[in-house]
């Protein structure tokens, strides 16, 4: 037990230690200050600026930035959809896999362009190497870069600067942050045992009978794996994601993945502190998601260590670790930490089956998806956190009779409406409406578990899509037959069609509506004239205000989603307790 807790503590300490250094580096990149990569990147970026037609790095308004995001993402999505749809006749397809069904192709394209990487397919039987490398790999960089660019634009606006230029921010995010770290990380993963090959499946004799053979899937995994984690993408090369020994063979690779997942979203808060020239406030704000993250990790780890008490009572033991759905090489501690990390950061990669988590883990992972700020998605998570902070400023100002201001700029009706729209409307609608429809029509469901856990499966699917996370409780009939099976006569199902199309709604609504609202909010803040601080100004860089902000986050999250949590993991926990009695 002690060893498991030490593993968790050391991982968190590593993340906390690198946050200020990486956060300061990202600030230098986007404030266009000198970095070590300038001699190489300046030339490459100049060529790319010329190619995309960026002249003079002109600043964009909120609407211009939003349109640039939408147009570029739409073009990329069309290209990738065409590539996957034509993979049967394209190169790098050693197993001759034909194109997937149109709804699987559509869902996959939208899922990866929104940085969700929700997968209703098995990578080794559905996509060619070309689709994985040229299509999904390309989207992993551009979707992560898009989120990071939006987060930086929001920080600029919040601190009174112009929003910047989307194309410049996207290119700098890729060339100076995502690509260099991915190159180094991929080399480290290859050295640690992650394969990187264009050869087809390995045909080997089985252990039981040397006269029989088996096909072992492999491929260019290492370079795919590192951007999967660093960009908070989460989509696996194989069906079992990072539980697969080729994606995550040992404890060292697992640690690299955890650090990669957490590095950008945690450091971006410190980046804000550099932009605002207020590192004290950044450190205090950092404590909010860090505290919630540690709390959820402890809750999940305790549940997995104690196991299912109903099963334990039948076995006649007081405690037995819940090893269902877990890899023995990672154990209960790393599985719990990874589950909380991947849902807190909207990465979505998994090393254990979330469907097999105890109710503690189900509560923690669902809560992360509902809140979206522990530490949140690539760039957008930090922006969501500050949207909560703006609401906290407004509420606190009304309570104490002081002018609601943030960084010397008044918080007025427009800011409150946009922040409330983000938190109280878009996310719940994208989750609860399709969830209600799925539960109301049995033909759509394909749910493997009745009762409370089945409800959690359905809501988790849409919460994961709306939060751009991509992980799943699974247990749903959301996968069409593999392309080779369809070619052999298997029929696509209406259940999988429903899940693919309804999840697309949640993916798009949960990605682009919040991005537009965040950019408009930031644009409005950037245009406000700063007001000199007076004795009536509410200070936002104090421990008291930080505590109030944490309270606002928990209260708003509880008010919106507590009924779902009560009918899902909380009710499931009481059900297990009743079985013991």
Curated annotation (Swiss-Prot):
It is a multi-pass membrane protein. It comes from the Bacteria. GO terms for cellular component: plasma membrane. It is found in: Cell inner membrane. Pfam families: KdpA (PF03814). Keywords: Cell inner membrane, Cell membrane, Ion transport, Membrane, Potassium, Potassium transport, Transmembrane, Transmembrane helix, Transport. Its main location: membrane. The keyword Ion transport applies. GO terms for molecular function: P-type potassium transmembrane transporter activity; potassium ion binding. The chain crosses the membrane at residues 2-22, 74-94, 135-155, 177-197, 255-275, 284-304, 332-352, 357-377, 381-401, 421-441, 501-521, 550-570. Part of the high-affinity ATP-driven potassium transport (or Kdp) system, which catalyzes the hydrolysis of ATP coupled with the electrogenic transport of potassium into the cytoplasm. This subunit binds the periplasmic potassium ions and delivers the ions to the membrane domain of KdpB through an intramembrane tunnel. Belongs to the KdpA family. The system is composed of three essential subunits: KdpA, KdpB and KdpC. This is Potassium-transporting ATPase potassium-binding subunit. The gene is kdpA.
């Amino acid at each position: 037990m002690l060893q498991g807790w030490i593993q968790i503590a050391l991982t968190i300490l590593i993340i906390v230690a690198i946050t200020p250094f990486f956060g300061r580096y990202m600030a230098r990149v986007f404030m266009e200050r000198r970095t070590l990569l300038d001699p190489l990147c300046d030339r490459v970026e100049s060529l790319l600026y010329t190619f995309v037609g960026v002249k003079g790095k002109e600043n964009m308004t909120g609407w211009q930035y939003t349109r640039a995001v939408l147009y570029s993402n739409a073009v990329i999505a069309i290209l990738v959809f065409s590539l996957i749809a034509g993979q049967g006749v394209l190169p790098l397809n050693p197993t001759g896999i034909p194109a997937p069904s149109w709804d699987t192709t559509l869902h996959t394209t939208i899922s990866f362009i929104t940085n969700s990487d929700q997968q209703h397919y098995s990578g080794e039987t559905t996509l060619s190497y070309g689709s994985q490398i040229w299509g999904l790999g390309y989207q992993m960089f551009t979707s992560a870069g898009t989120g990071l660019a939006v987060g930086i634009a929001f920080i600029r606006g919040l601190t009174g600067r112009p929003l910047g230029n989307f194309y410049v921010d996207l290119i700098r995010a890729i060339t100076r942050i995502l690509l260099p770290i991915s190159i180094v990380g991929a080399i480290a993963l290859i050295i640690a045992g992650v394969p990187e090959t264009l050869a087809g499946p390995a045909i080997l004799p089985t252990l039981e009978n040397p006269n029989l053979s088996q096909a072992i899937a492999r491929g260019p995994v290492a370079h795919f794996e590192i951007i999967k984690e660093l960009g908070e993408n989460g989509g696996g090369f194989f069906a079992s994601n990072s539980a697969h020994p080729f994606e995550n063979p040992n404890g060292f690779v697992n640690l690299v993945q955890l650090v990669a997942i957490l590095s950008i979203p945690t450091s971006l808060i410190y980046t804000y502190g550099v932009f605002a020239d207020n590192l004290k406030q950044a450190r205090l704000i950092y404590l909010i998601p860090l505290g919630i993250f540690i709390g959820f990790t402890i809750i999940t780890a305790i549940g997995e260590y104690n196991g299912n008490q109903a099963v334990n009572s039948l076995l006649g033991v007081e405690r037995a670790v819940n090893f269902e759905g877990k890899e023995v090489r990672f154990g209960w501690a790393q599985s719990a930490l990874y589950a909380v990390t991947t849902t807190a950061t909207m990465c979505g990669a998994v090393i254990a089956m979330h469907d097999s988590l105890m109710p503690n883990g189900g509560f923690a992972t669902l809560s992360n998806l509902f809140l979206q700020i522990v530490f949140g998605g690539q760039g957008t998570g930090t922006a969501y956190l500050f949207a909560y902070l703006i609401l906290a400023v407004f509420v606190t100002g009304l309570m104490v009779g002081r002018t609601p201001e943030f960084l010397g700029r008044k918080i007025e009706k427009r800011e409150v409406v946009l922040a409330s729209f983000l938190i109280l409307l878009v996310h719940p609608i994208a989750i609860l409406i399709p969830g209600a429809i799925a539960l109301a029509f049995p033909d759509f469901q394909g749910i493997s578990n009745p009762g409370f856990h089945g409800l959690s499966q359905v809501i988790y699917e849409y919460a994961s899509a709306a939060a751009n996370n991509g992980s799943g409780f699974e247990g749903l009939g959301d996968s069409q037959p593999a392309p080779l099976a369809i070619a052999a006569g298997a029929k696509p199902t209406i259940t999988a069609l429903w899940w693919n199309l309804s999840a697309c709604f949640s993916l798009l609504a949960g990605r682009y509506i919040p991005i537009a609202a965040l950019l408009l909010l930031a644009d409005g803040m950037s245009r406000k004239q700063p007001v000199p601080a007076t004795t009536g100004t509410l200070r936002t860089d104090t421990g008291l205000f930080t505590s109030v902000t944490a309270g606002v986050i928990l209260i708003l999250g509880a008010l919106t989603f507590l009924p779902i949590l009560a009918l899902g993991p909380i009710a499931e926990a009481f059900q297990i307790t009743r079985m013991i009695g």
